[in-house]
Amino acid sequence: MIGALFPVAPQSAPPKPAQRAFSVTLQVVAVCLGTVVLLARVAHIPAWDCMYAEDYGVYFVQALHHPWQVFVPYYGYLQLVPRLIGQAASLVPLKAAAAVFAVAGAAIAGGCALFIYHASAGFIESRALRAVLGAALVLLPIAPLEVVGNGVNSTWYIMAALFWAALWRPRTRSGMAVAAMVAFAATASTPMAIIYAPLLAARVFALPKLREHAVTAGWLAGWVVQVPVILYSYANHTQRLRTFSPPGKVIAYYLHTVVLRALGWHLSWRLESIAGRNDATLIVGASLAVILGWAAITQGRQVRVFVVTAVATGFVYTVLAAVITRLVVFTAPLSGPVAFEPGSRYSVVPVFLLDAALIVAANAVLRRGGAAVGLATVRPRVMVAVAALGCVLAVGWVTDFRYLTQRTTNGHWRNVAVKWLNTCEHSRTGTITVPAWVTGTVTMSCSNLRR
């Protein structure tokens, strides 16, 4: 049963040099296209001219003040990937710093989508459906609320990729290296990666050979840098874990921010306006339960194991995030002119895994319908089922492609950069004091600002 979680992808003939070159080019274009699409999803102020939340208040300001000090805690743990992006942003002209965060965050998401396309081959033989899976990450309906086009929340895309890395059995050393890098980046950026411990333990049990555990090694290596930072935070009484959310609030949070929002942000609010929040949640939840339950019962052991694993992982992930982040369970979402959902970043992985379960089920239906022989042999009802899945996902993709959120309420970064540079030009001390999180302000040398 556990072995069904780690299938080997069908092996294809080695590509010719021209085919390999074309494939590499196509993949680079796909990541670039995904990056552009993600940047386009930010409404009002362009993503490349807006520095969001900790990108400004923590990572950028601290990179300017203390260059290359990336192994330091914030909120009780290490966030290595956002720290590295912040360091990169500090090395470019000040006016372009916001663009570094935006493009890096979008490129990471696009790269994760491409990685998932490859890593899901053992479960999804259809290349078209694997492309749909990658698109599901790029076009995730809730993404504009917090995670699109910034550095601080790029980690949650990597966490989605880590789920697939834990299941993937790469044949090549390059594939193993990429899987290890994904695992290391995730674990070194958030201790939430602990949720994949049971999955990786199952991998060790099912696949005892050492060559199967590049991802496990990467995950463990991430803890080598993460644990000392967490312990340092406890020693200085700045740890993350202080109080916990009530269990009832946590379950309600999962139902209302994951299940209800799974098929679309605006669609969920429309359902709420008609049926009320709880009934709308029941409608969406029952629909998902029927579809995924049917797939688990009728589409074979591999689909059944995957559906259970994906749903359970998403549930545990959300519960853990909500338990240790009291703010998100006590703050109401907003659907007005400026949309906001507290902690929507924690919905990325569970919502994406629900989409993945639907797509894996669709692949099984397509395969049983004759897709292995050719499209000409696929029964019409099978094509209807796959088309229906596309329509369900497309509703959220279209209606939630771009909308105004609190993500851009910080204003234009270019104006801030000009103000900083003007202040430095007239500074008698050669220093500048700027707003910062945690400490309130930071005073740094004007020589740290690149023009």
Tell what function each PLM region has.
Residues 1-64, 68-146, 173-177, 181, ...:
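Intrinsically disordered, polar/acidic, low-complexity terminal segments
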Residues 143-162:
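Multi-pass, polyprenyl lipid-linked donor-dependent membrane glycosyltransferases
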Residues 154-156, 333-363:
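Hydrophobic/aromatic-rich transmembrane helices and adjacent perimembrane loops
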Residues 158, 162-178:
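Membrane-interface transmembrane helices that cradle and orient dolichyl/undecaprenyl
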Residues 165-172, 199-204, 288-295, 348-368:
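Transmembrane alpha-helices and membrane-interface helical segments
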Residues 181-202:
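Transmembrane helices and adjacent periplasmic/lumenal helix-loop junctions
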Residues 316-334:
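Membrane-interface helix-loop junctions at the exits of transmembrane helices
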